[in-house]
């Protein structure tokens, strides 16, 4: 015979189980769960393993072997689909990949803080996730960059660059009473890039042929408003910042004592004459590629142990002579139209409805 307490305990047990089950169904799905659901988890694991191999080759300066490893990732039946799903997971939007069909791009102009505008190429969402996959494959090259080249990967943001510059200034002021800090930017940096020279410098001829063809094809897509092509390296493509930073590192970062973030340069020198000479030497190295230093951007900052001053660089501030860094914290904007919770049930429904996995696994887009 069931007692009242037994019935109550049983009710609470069932209720607690249902609540736990409900919470599991309501919580956001993890990346691993989504990849497992799509049958692409092994592809992701293989990507991580092969990326380590590629990084080791890049660090050793063996570009041919590094690109051969990237080729293995490219032709792997699951790696590219897994990376596509990763991009969708991060944006919480299941987008059908759109590799290279004939489309026209849009150009938007973003206001710069220092005046002027920056032309940004806006690609179709389906094309953007494909470009992002190319970027993930290329980013194994970052380990070969100078430790003075920053940007576009974890652990090398603007604040890391400013901290690095402040440390160099501190080291210089520890040795002597004064120093000179010089900053400058490149003129129309992305638009001035010679794509052929970039590909030769970075030895991209060793990339898989289809990857090269895609990059070259995307580079020559027409702009809808102007019915014209893209000048230089397209701003707005996911892989462009990686290629540009790598290119500048090869041209200058590996040879000179500058802290570099994208097209922003800063260095600390003993005297103004040394600083001026360094700027001229940097321009000589850059001229081989057609890139130019913007003359109006060259600024000399005198640092003195007995004088207080400050430098604003990359949105952050350095106080002298203490070399203290005050970081600017940017508030992240949340897209109000994005769902806050994507459960595994939601992912399952979307993947099935679109037939997304079958579309992503279709390797026809690799064949030209």
From Swiss-Prot:
Gene behind this protein: RTL
Cellular component annotations (GO), alphabetically ordered: mitochondrion
Principal subcellular localisation of the protein: mitochondrion
InterPro entries in UniProt: DNA/RNA_pol_sf (IPR043502), RT_dom (IPR000477)
Descriptive protein name: Reverse transcriptase-like protein
Organism: Chlamydomonas reinhardtii
Domain Reverse transcriptase: start-end pairs: 91-318
Pfam families documented for this protein: RVT_1
Keywords: Mitochondrion
Location(s), subcellular: Mitochondrion
